[in-house]
Amino acid sequence: MSLRLSGGRKLQSPPGSTARPTPARVRQAVMNMLSADLPGCSWLDLCCGSGVMACEAIQRGARRVVAVDQDRRMAATARGNLALVAGAQTPPANVTVVQQDILRWLRQGVSACGLEAALEEGASLAGFDLIYADPPYASGLYPQICEAITGGGWLNAGGLLLLECASAQKPALPPGWSVVKERRYGTSTVLMLKPTEDPTT
């Protein structure tokens, strides 16, 4: 399968992959929706697959990007794609790819997740301004991801969590989250969420 960013750059897909990449139409709509938030932001991509959403975010000014997937082939592909796109920016974006079970990694918390070595010199470990989660639609992981983000201090104050899910089966959300926007794109829906309380308190 051939993947292209909205700007036309070609990306790689894992060979023989049955992954479900976010459609170009959805990617473009999400990036437009976040246009004011992306420049200079920190972006966490959960169940990143080929890394295409994180690549789109980098093209639009994200400065610190972490992409996580438990599949070895997916993580390797994301690493190559993100290095290509990040290296084309001036200065290059700070990119880290993690191959690990999503929930196990999130539940460590941001202070114990092993990202310190990837920080720029003089920077302190912090959460993320924007988090995008796109697990397999039928996985049932959405509530657990939300809870792990809250419990682990992953979201900065004023930050947003975006969930990509099936339009026909939107997930039930745990307490502590409210829907800011909901956009349907055919069989896919994107929910933009924020905590009902400041996540840093």
What are the residue ranges of the model-derived segments?
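Class I S-adenosyl-L-methionine-dependent methyltransferase catalytic core
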Residues: 1-201
